[in-house]
Amino acid sequence: MAKKRIAVLFGGASADHAASLHTAYSVLSAMPKEIEPLAIGITRAGRWLFYPGSYENIKDGSWEQDSDCCSCIISPDMTNKGVIKIISDGESTIHRIDAVFPVLHGKYGEDGRVQGLCKLAGLPIIGNDFAAAALCNDRRI
């Protein structure tokens, strides 16, 4: 049986960026062997990077300087269901995924935006859907 491939989103353009890095390290380090995690880091500036390196480098933020990082996006095309890696020479590859596990904290991570993107792409998400995330995050509604 093929391993399930889970995209783990971490970091983010929020004040809780550092907390998300520690959560990502814990989650990725504890992934069962039957899961193939894909680490997708989001910088403080909001840049999405495919990160194939050591999980140890996530904790201190040095993952962003890894020369093997490359830009990536979640494909909004429901027929692709994957992460598109954008290689420096303009080429791209799609890595199919079975689900998304956002370990983002705060704005842009727990407020329904990422959850809505996953819904648009037809990807299952681990955690709240976009409506529940938006309602629970915005305490002024």
Language model features with spans:
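ATP-binding N-terminal substructure of ATP-dependent carboxylate-amine bond-forming enzymes
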Residues: 1-141
